[in-house]
A protein has these predicted regions:
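Short sequence/structural segments immediately N-terminal
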Residues: 2-168
Length: 168
């Protein structure tokens, strides 16, 4: 009499399932480990602070940081005052989005040189200009709000936050 083969097939399926789980666990473990290592190596927690030196963890921002130190806003504003929304949720959502985009671009060496501001970041900067300087520009704002070709503050005042770039 022959031995039934059903238990052997069940054992084989269990073994394959266990190996697949071990393999998946290893892949997830390596991915998480690499993410934690990269976050630590890039001093990721510093990006959650208001310290402007966090912006120069990445060498590509050194020129902007140096310009800010010598610029007119150094005594009054940090990077976050201009580059992230004021509300808590918007602030950290923007920091996460910027951190992801910057780390991806830095890792893949996919930065435009010199670094350029994105349209969404330009809107945040403009809104923060208005938040601090609204009383001085109220007539301009009310006029440009009706204009289909509204002008962002930094289109004319491009050197205010980071100082003059070489050659300007």
């Amino acid at each position: 009499m022959s031995v039934p083969q059903a238990p052997a097939k069940a054992n084989q399926k269990r073994r394959i399932g266990a190996l697949a789980l071990v393999f998946l666990g290893c892949v997830v473990g390596v991915a998480v480990g690499m993410g934690v290592y990269t976050f630590d190596y890039a001093e990721g927690m510093s990006y959650m602070s208001n310290d402007p030196t966090a912006c120069v963890n990445c060498h590509i921002m050194q020129e902007q940081y140096d310009g800010w130190q010598h610029g007119s806003h150094h005594a009054a504003a940090t990077c976050n005052d201009c580059h992230v929304p004021v509300d808590l949720l918007g602030k950290y959502a923007t920091k996460i989005e910027h951190g992801y985009r910057h780390s991806k671009a830095f890792t893949l060496d996919d930065f435009a040189e010199p670094i350029r501001i994105t349209p969404s970041s330009l809107t945040v900067v403009h809104n923060n200009c208005i938040r601090c300087h609204g009383e001085y520009v109220s007539q301009i704002i009310s006029h440009s709000a009706k204009d289909a070709d509204a002008v962002y503050c930094v289109q004319c005042h491009s050197t205010v936050g980071h100082g003059r770039k070489s050659g300007q």
